[in-house]
């Protein structure tokens, strides 16, 4: 049953995710940012859920490159592709850090929590430290743990249907407005 309080693109996305089943692509999204040198940067991150009606939640390490990128330019784009429905969603918006992230930390497994205490992303691994990837328990919230809130301004959906592809654009002003556009 459709949730009338959600934007219509959320219904389409929910349908795509349901058809995708337990595939990793159901949670893996591609996040594009712009570096301090004004160069594009792209990486795969994990979709962690929704904040309010139309903001995505992403976890990251405070020491990662993307934190610097987002501080200098909060504009970002997320691409989410579903193979079974041949649907490509492009989300444009701004990313900000959520200051109240304790509840999200509490949802993580001990294995996941341990990873926030490992070495900095992109640094050479110190093999002399045996406990570098040790799984610990009862860990306090790491200062490296960051919850990002991706506030979506527009959604571009391309359905690779045959014989004709379909494309829709939603833009948020006071409310979400949907327009069918040429693929």
Predicted ranges, named:
Residues 2-4, 87-183:
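Charged, gly/pro-rich active-site loop segments
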Residues 27-29, 43, 74, 143-146, ...:
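Short beta-strand or tight-loop elements
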Residues 48-86:
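A short mixed-secondary-structure module that forms the rim of ligand-binding clefts
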Residues 34, 61, 81, 94, ...:
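Structured loops at beta-to-helix junctions and adjacent beta-edge loops in soluble globular domains
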Residues 33-37, 80-84, 159-162, 172:
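Short acidic, glycine-rich loop/turn motifs
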Residues 24-25, 81-82, 118-120:
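A short, aromatic/hydrophobic, helix- or strand-capping loop or linear motif
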Residues 1-53, 68-69:
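An N-terminal domain-cap segment
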């Amino acid at each position: 049953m459709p949730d009338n309080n959600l934007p219509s693109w959320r219904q389409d996305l929910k349908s795509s995710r349901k058809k995708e089943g337990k595939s990793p692509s159901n949670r893996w999204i591609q996040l594009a940012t712009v570096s301090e040198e004004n160069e594009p940067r792209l990486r795969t991150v994990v979709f962690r859920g929704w904040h309010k009606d139309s903001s995505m939640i992403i976890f990251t390490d405070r020491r990662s490159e993307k934190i610097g990128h987002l501080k200098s330019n909060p504009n970002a784009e997320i691409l989410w592709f579903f193979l079974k429905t041949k649907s490509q969603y492009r989300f444009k918006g701004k990313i900000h850090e959520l200051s109240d992230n304790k509840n999200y930390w509490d949802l993580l497994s001990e294995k996941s929590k341990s990873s926030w205490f490992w070495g900095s992303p992109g640094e050479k691994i110190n093999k002399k430290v045996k406990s570098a990837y040790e799984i610990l328990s009862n860990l306090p919230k790491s200062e490296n743990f960051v919850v990002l809130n991706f506030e979506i301004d527009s959604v571009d959906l391309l359905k690779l249907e045959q014989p004709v592809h379909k494309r829709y654009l939603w833009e948020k002003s006071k409310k979400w407005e949907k327009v069918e556009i040429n693929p």
